[in-house]
């Protein structure tokens, strides 16, 4: 047995695999010395016995048993035969889950190019060969020959393209009796491309390119730099350009491309099985044609069909006609499974479903503090259930977990009190997809609310790029003390006032907040109710408005706490409009926006002309600053 691999690693690097590496992935030597791993038959399962066909796409000898601890022929059953390889069928007695990671391979009768490197943007194959993509395609798909060695012919050059007619003409000249031509070699298909790539000396080409770059400029220089960058990457990773042409293709584990039986006895299968079957059929047919020395034109056509089959397997529809299945639906290739929103990376690896998380619509919570969020009770009891159960048992309200769950389902009032205690000081993380920057996920202190919607402070919306037209957000509960501390110290919404990208404030009032501020402080000459009334303090003015004694925009006089307080107005307010002397000798000076009472030239009280709306606005800001 192989020693257990150390699972610790720093990073994963994706690169080109050599034919030997691909073979290693799928090849295994059985204890009896038999080497298995090559898939040679297109069959999947036997429709009578419903067992996988040997050497086929679901072969138990290559990929492992379909049933736990049971070989294909049934000679060995049960776990006591663990590790034995059946002498009759050659299947190792082990768990069936090995079929999720054991791979196979198909040895191709002729090399084929990898469609990603040929038809990708940019085309690395054409950049490396310093040829036009159209020309490389002509060679790969058997539409043109390429000169591999011009020999002593003066009218031929290395990598020159030739049509069928041109090559026949040159061939006639070579085989003529009086011909002095020799050493001419031409090729066609992926084999010719493989030969050209094998003949490349990367270090030498890189040196030549560096010299040329120093002497050139403009578009030519940019093209040379592009080619040099690709060559340098090949040198740095230790990959060979010839590996872009495939001699062996891997067959992914059968449980990742399953075949399941439906109720009516029919089978549903992964599209990959159809694509692999096409490759194997064409590969076997090509091998047979080569064996019987079939005419070149037939062999060449079969090689082209094999190239197209491998292209469809790797990336269906990238080049040529898309391969379709039943109902004219395009078959899903390996690329389709990996890429996009529903692909393996974004759907299954990055987008895993996790415990202790919930999701709901967001609504505005204007009464919340910026670092708070409203969490529906129904969601909170589910998210914090383990914590609530633990606390219920510790408080002695229940004796075991089962009783605690019953109490929670019943909705006992004591449960809500315990939940309040549990969530106090326990931050939760709110995330809105797509999380485009680090402020897309922030921590908040949960406040229990009625209803089924998460309440969010309107000021944090710009960071999440959220609005309240049906947006949804996910809630996550940090479990460990370290994650809770990190959430509180680094991720709490009140610590994320500035954008990390620009350094400018990302928390700024907008829309209805700006409208509300404007409405509170605006003027409205039609608001006359309570106009000209005097109030001794802010609270009296606010209460008068709340009881409907004055309008929000009516001008009233409010006593200032500091008689010498400077009142800021749009226009200078220094001109005394009227002076009034009282019986006690004090003087009241009437200004446009204030009234000041003075005794012996010293101000003893001051009334400011304002509106209840402006008083409320000022009071709210003062209260917020005082609390902070």
Swiss-Prot record:
SMART domains linked: RPOLA_N (SM00663)
Disulfide bonds: none
Cofactor note: Binds 1 Mg(2+) ion per subunit.
An annotated GO cellular component: DNA-directed RNA polymerase complex
Catalytic reaction(s) noted: RNA(n) + a ribonucleoside 5'-triphosphate = RNA(n+1) + diphosphate
Enzyme Commission numbers on file: 2.7.7.6
Annotated Mg(2+) binding sites: 467, 469, 471
EC top class named in words: transferase
One annotated GO biological process: DNA-templated transcription
Entry keywords, A to Z: DNA-directed RNA polymerase, Magnesium, Metal-binding, Nucleotidyltransferase, Transcription, Transferase, Zinc
Subunit structure: In cyanobacteria the RNAP catalytic core is composed of 2 alpha, 1 beta, 1 beta', 1 gamma and 1 omega subunit. When a sigma factor is associated with the core the holoenzyme is formed, which can initiate transcription.
Job of this protein: DNA-dependent RNA polymerase catalyzes the transcription of DNA into RNA using the four ribonucleoside triphosphates as substrates.
Name this protein carries in UniProt: DNA-directed RNA polymerase subunit gamma
Species in which this protein is naturally found: Crocosphaera subtropica (strain ATCC 51142 / BH68) (Cyanothece sp. (strain ATCC 51142))
């Amino acid at each position: 047995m192989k020693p257990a691999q150390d699972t610790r690693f720093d990073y994963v690097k994706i690169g080109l695999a050599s034919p030997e590496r691909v073979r290693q992935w799928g090849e295994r030597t059985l204890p009896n010395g038999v080497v298995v791993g090559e898939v040679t038959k297109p069959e999947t399962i036997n429709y009578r016995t419903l067992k996988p066909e040997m050497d086929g796409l679901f072969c138990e000898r290559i990929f492992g048993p379909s049933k736990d601890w049971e070989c294909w022929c049934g000679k060995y059953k049960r776990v006591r035969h663990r590790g034995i390889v059946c002498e009759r069928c050659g299947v190792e007695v082990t768990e069936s889950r090995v079929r999720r990671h054991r791979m196979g391979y198909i040895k191709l009768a002729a090399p084929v190019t990898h469609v990603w490197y040929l038809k990708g943007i940019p085309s690395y194959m054409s950049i490396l060969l310093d040829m036009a993509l159209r020309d490389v395609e002509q060679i790969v798909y058997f539409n043109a020959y390429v000169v591999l060695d011009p020999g002593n012919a003066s009218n031929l050059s290395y990598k020159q393209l030739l049509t069928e007619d041109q090559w026949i003409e040159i061939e006639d000249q070579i085989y003529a009796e009086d011909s002095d031509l020799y050493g001419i070699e031409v090729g066609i298909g992926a084999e010719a491309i493989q030969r050209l790539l094998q003949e490349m000396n990367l270090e030498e080409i890189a040196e030549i390119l560096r010299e040329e770059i120093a002497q050139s400029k403009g578009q030519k220089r940019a093209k040379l730099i592009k080619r040099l960058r690709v060559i340098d990457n090949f040198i740095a990773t230790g990959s060979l350009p010839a590996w872009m042409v495939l001699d062996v293709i891997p067959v992914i584990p059968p449980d990742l491309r399953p075949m399941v039986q439906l109720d009516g006895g029919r089978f549903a299968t992964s599209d990959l099985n159809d694509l692999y079957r096409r490759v194997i059929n064409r590969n076997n047919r090509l091998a047979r044609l080569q064996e019987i020395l079939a005419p070149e034109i037939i062999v060449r056509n079969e090689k082209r069909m094999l190239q197209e089959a491998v292209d469809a397997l790797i990336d269906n529809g990238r080049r040529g006609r898309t391969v379709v299945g039943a109902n004219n639906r395009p078959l899903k290739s390996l690329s389709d499974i990996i890429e996009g929103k529903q692909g393996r990376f974004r759907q299954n690896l990055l987008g895993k479903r996790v415990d202790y998380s919930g999701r709901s619509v967001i609504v505005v919570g204007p009464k919340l503090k910026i670092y708070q969020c409203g969490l529906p009770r129904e969601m909170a009891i589910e998210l914090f259930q383990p914590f609530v159960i633990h606390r219920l048992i510790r408080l002695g309200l229940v004796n075991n977990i089962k009783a605690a769950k019953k109490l929670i389902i019943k909705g006992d009032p004591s449960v809500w009190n315990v939940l309040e205690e549990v969530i106090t000081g326990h931050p939760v993380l709110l995330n809105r997809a797509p999380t485009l920057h680090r402020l897309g996920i922030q921590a908040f202190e949960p406040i229990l609310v009625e209803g089924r919607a998460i309440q969010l402070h309107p000021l944090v919306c710009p960071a999440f790029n959220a609005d309240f037209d049906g947006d949804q957000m996910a809630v996550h509960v940090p479990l460990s003390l370290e994650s809770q501390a990190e959430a509180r110290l680094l991720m709490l919404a009140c610590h994320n006032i500035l954008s990390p990208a620009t350094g400018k404030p990302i928390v700024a009032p907008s829309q209805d907040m700006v409208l509300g501020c404007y409405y509170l402080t605006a003027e409205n000459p039609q608001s006359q109710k309570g106009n000209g009334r005097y109030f001794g303090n802010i609270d009296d003015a606010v209460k008068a408005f709340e009881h409907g004694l004055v309008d929000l925009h009516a001008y009233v006089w409010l006593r200032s706490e500091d008689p010498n307080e400077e009142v800021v107005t749009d226009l200078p307010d220094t001109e005394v409009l009227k002076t009034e002397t009282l019986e006690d000798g004090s003087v009241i000076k009437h200004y446009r926006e204030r009234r000041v009472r003075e005794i012996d030239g010293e101000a003893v009280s001051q009334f400011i002309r304002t509106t209840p709306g402006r008083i409320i606005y000022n009071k709210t800001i003062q209260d917020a600053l005082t609390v902070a």
